[in-house]
Amino acid sequence: MAKYSNINSFNALQTLTVGSSNYQIFSLTQAEKKLGDIAKLPKSLKVLLENLLRFEDQLSVKTEHIYALAEWLKTRTSDQEIQYRPARVLMQDFTGVPAVVDLAAMRAAMAEAGGDPEKINPLSPVDLVIDHSVMVDHFADDQAFEENVQIEMQRNGERYQFLRWGQSAFNNFSVVPPGTGICHQVNLEYLAQAVWLGEDDGQTFAFPDTLVGTDSHTTMINGLGVLGWGVGGIEAEAAMLGQPISMLIPEVIGFKLTGKLQEGITATDLVLTITQMLRQKGVVGKFVEFYGDGLADLPLADRATIANMAPEYGATCGFFPIDEVTLGYLKLTGRQSDRIALVEAYSKAQGLWRNAGDEPVFTDTLSLDMSTVQASLAGPKRPQDRVLLSEVPKTFNALMELTLKPAKEAKERLENEGGGGTAVEATKANIQHESPSCVIEGQEYPLNHGDVVISAITSCTNTSNPSVMLAAGLLAKKAIEKGLQRKPWVKSSLAPGSKVVTDYLLAAGLTPYLDELGYNLVGYGCTTCIGNSGPLPEPIEEAIQCHDLNVASVLSGNRNFEGRVHPLVKTNWLASPPLVVAYGLVGNIRTDLTTQPIGQGKDGQPVYLKDIWPSQAEIDAVLQKVNTDMFHKEYAAVFDGDESWQAIQIPKSKTYEWADDSTYIRHPPFFEGIGEPPKPIKNIEQARILAVLGDSVTTDHISPAGNIKKDSPAGRYLQEQGVEPKDFNSYGSRRGNHEVMMRGTFANIRIKNEMLGGEEGGNTIHVPSGEKLAIYDAAMRYQQEHTPLVIIAGKEYGTGSSRDWAAKGTNLLGVKAVIAESFERIHRSNLVGMGVLPLQFVDGQTRQSLNLTGHEVISIRGLSDGIQPHEILEVDVKGPNGVASHFNVLCRIDTLNEVEYFKAGGILHYVLRNLIAS
């Protein structure tokens, strides 16, 4: 059977000759003769159009779907569902391990049903990069990297053996070993090709490189002109197994960039500005495409930084078309010359090349003159909350005022007791200015609100960008020369996304200065950005906990959600790598770095940020040290791994041999009874509310990735299995064990359940008894009582990481529906993919306007009649006082394909049932 379309309704199949090579392409220019003028389509939509032409089969891709993309130009929007097939899949290990567990479980289910387990195999290339498991246990010394790698291998040996089994058992499945880099940076520097090649019937086809990834920051690759975005692991698994991505033709927001960044302004400042602008615009579920003459001078690394943060500005992707800058980067990073020639020829032939003055048709537009961008951070709790560098102290002080302001009833009580306002103010002042001390390396230091305890150069967002990395090194050099040192209470680290970074820092002579300040290499992986910051020194943790200090982290990452970076660090600030180092020097965020000194130099004079900030000319001079040989050297053996990786013993079987005593890899229950027909969809009757949550509940809140508390349900389970707390590892590393993960669902210590008055922590009220329980324990009691459950929430439910366990855990707790004001794209899809119904309040109603307290009984009508996309359903409510009411909700099953997945119990159930039937 042909892999690509042999229907060719639009006579698009043509031969493209580049040099001495011939390639088959589905020509958009040829298709235009039937489709009409499509030249003005956004280039990101042209990629989708080519995909439909190539996979036209009159079943999943029909002529009408192809015409719908051309018709988009008339209305600049569409309600047409299409079936999109990306060329490949990218994974990291936190999401990759549970995905491979699912594939292994599907093989077991296939064998149990009497089928061939090897039918469960990726049909398109899958690359899994192990980058999420390294933690910053050791830092600020020359041995930190080796020690952290050793601990990583000890902690994760079982997981890594499982991944090595997967690499040997599945076709089209490659693993990049630990200690190599971050998946998105490895993708940018090596895996991505801009134009992909495929063989069919003895011929070579050329087409746009496209992908989906099991990490929300897969979007980074759009900086290279490669269309890609994050999906949940379950959706990625379905894509691997040949299931198309079901999607509506998106709206495309054009973002025009003009001008140039001013001296001293970084790509980080630019991306934080863009993130704020697009969040205010509202681009959830939409493509963003960048255009304008400003792109001509915007380096590829800056484009990748902007594309990386698409999840933070809410878009499906932030796409940069291919141009001369793209070709220059492909050449720098060592891509083959014939592939670079093909990228240029193909892009120009297909109208995918960016020409000066291009003005595609967009749904809507906004623009930014880059010369207006100012030095910025984002914080303290959301990446879209940009704060000018000069405003950081004021922002923090305002936060502290709110934090320390006594409650109205407490103030009234004090006044009635004769304490008056003075006592209240004195209490506030005491909390604000009390300076507990901590002993570090034998010396006592004060620790206060606003002190920086973590300063981390981390994350592919910025470590993929030589300009800001070299700026950090130059700032470190100037700081050392002035006689400055990092403050001793600051945990500092350098964790690049690629070994090339340390090569060019060393070649530029900057490594010794970073090391002297304590920014030694700690690993090649995500570390602090995803919460793998490791423990703080014990005296610092004790001081924070004893005095309830609001301390800070400053990191060059892309997310700063509450509780993500470190559970004891309440405020987190995103900043460029040189600013990360600057805050490590000053040691607090109360100092205005634009007007106040960072410290005192060895000459006794105050040193200001402007005294050590590198000029663009200085940065440009050391940028010359970045060369192609570095990329060739580091990627020549990218799949080989070190001796400890190669020494891992690999089981030889094609089906996985599950170990009953494993606490990392367990046979999940998702496919039990898969041989039986799916049960018909019924109304949800007499459900209880498990939790009432507010706005911006992240997938970190729902399924944390970081530390497992000893006294949590997951911690107690692990101790019952004989695991000591020091060996708990993290939730993220335990995602191959459903027993841990379901206990960790809604277990983030910063989640606030309104049923408990907004108290922090993963607890709830078991309504019939009135007992306060951990959410997991309450859910299990409800299951024993055969009571279905719902979650009530506010806006942006499920924002953040593409974390399929946020949906899997919700399913395993017995939650049948989530009713929210709005959903983030990936989590909504994941809920459907796990058979959980996403429902949206309508007509401006909210949990507050409906007076939902969590003590009601909920019934959801209209499901048993046959569910449809975007159907209005009725919710019946019975209050604790017996008063009945009802309200309507919008069913957020968005496509007909999703209806089929939901009816089957989930997307993987749908795929597996079809494979068993065949």
Enumerate the language-model features and the residues they cover.
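Fe-S-dependent hydro-lyases/dehydratases of central metabolism
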Residues: 1-918
